[in-house]
A protein has these predicted regions:
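Acidic/histidine-rich, metal-coordinating catalytic segments
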Residues: 118, 126-141, 213-216
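Basic, flexible linker segments flanking DNA-binding modules
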Residues: 1-69, 162, 217
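Active-site beta-loop-alpha junctions of metal-dependent nucleic acid enzymes
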Residues: 85, 103-125
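Mobile genetic element proteins and their domesticated derivatives, centered on retroelements
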Residues: 14, 30, 34, 63, ...
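An active-site-proximal beta-strand-loop segment
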Residues: 68-101, 107-108
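Conserved, non-catalytic sequence blocks in retroelement Pol enzymes and Pol-derived host proteins
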Residues: 4-7, 20-23, 65-66, 81-83, ...
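RNase H-like polynucleotidyl transferase catalytic core
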Residues: 43-48, 131-135, 150-168, 184-187
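C-terminal domain-tail junction helix/linker
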Residues: 149-153, 175-218
Length: 218
């Protein structure tokens, strides 16, 4: 069970997963068994990544005081292949449900990457009232702003230098790296594309969310 879920589950989620199989154990017992078996939830590690600069004035955060707003969040993160090559993952997340609506991987971090990713989400889901992003050049480009205007979606922006304004999708990308990327090797972008798609399907449909289960875990 631990192995089949990307080694991502610590004692609280393992307790919930076992309960789904009608196997009920106290969390302290599960922790003891995990220690004796050398099982632990995977931990994150850091790597140095390329940096980008922004030459734009601050634009408004429209959803800061609207936590229940009908909004999507979008971001780009860096991933690395075995040969050291950087590739780029763009993702669209629905803030209400914490579901990934679309994603795209590319060898170039350009406007085309974010346009394709957003267009995929719009083709399969009802458009949001707001889209929240950082102020990277891809998201402030004429083409991207024009697409939002065409669909009458208001663009909300994180404050410059404050990535946690986009915390939910930052959190998803962090989980992706900790629970999957750092555990495997990717000899090609094709391997990475396949494994990221599998992880996102698991994340959307199978990964246990303690907050949503309303079950006492301590």
């Amino acid at each position: 069970m631990w192995q089949n879920n990307y080694k991502a589950y610590g004692a609280p989620r393992l307790r919930l997963a076992l309960a789904d199989l009608n196997l009920h154990h106290g969390i302290n017992r599960i922790r003891r068994l995990m220690r004796s078996a050398g099982i632990y939830s995977v931990m994150s590690r850091r790597f140095n990544k390329p940096t980008t600069t922004v030459d734009y004035s601050q634009r408004p955060n429209l959803i800061k005081h609207l936590p229940a707003a009908n909004a999507w969040s979008m971001d780009i993160t860096y991933l690395k292949l075995n040969n050291g090559q950087w590739v780029y993952l763009a993702s669209v997340l629905e803030l209400r449900t914490y579901q990934i609506l679309s994603h795209q991987i590319s060898t170039t971090m350009d406007t085309r990457l974010v346009l394709i990713t957003l267009q995929r989400a719009l083709s399969t889901h009802q458009k949001p009232s707001y889209l929240h992003t950082d102020m990277g050049s891809q998201f402030t480009s004429f083409g991207f702003e024009n697409l939002l205007n065409h669909h009458k979606i208001d663009h909300s922006y994180s404050k410059l230098g404050h990535p946690y304004d986009n915390a939910r999708i930052e959190s998803f990308h962090s989980l992706l790296k900790r629970e999957m990327i750092y555990q495997f090797r990717f000899p090609s972008i094709a391997h990475l594309i396949l494994d990221v798609a599998k992880y996102i399907h698991w994340f959307n449909n199978e990964r246990i969310s303690i907050a949503n289960r309303k079950m006492k875990v301590a």
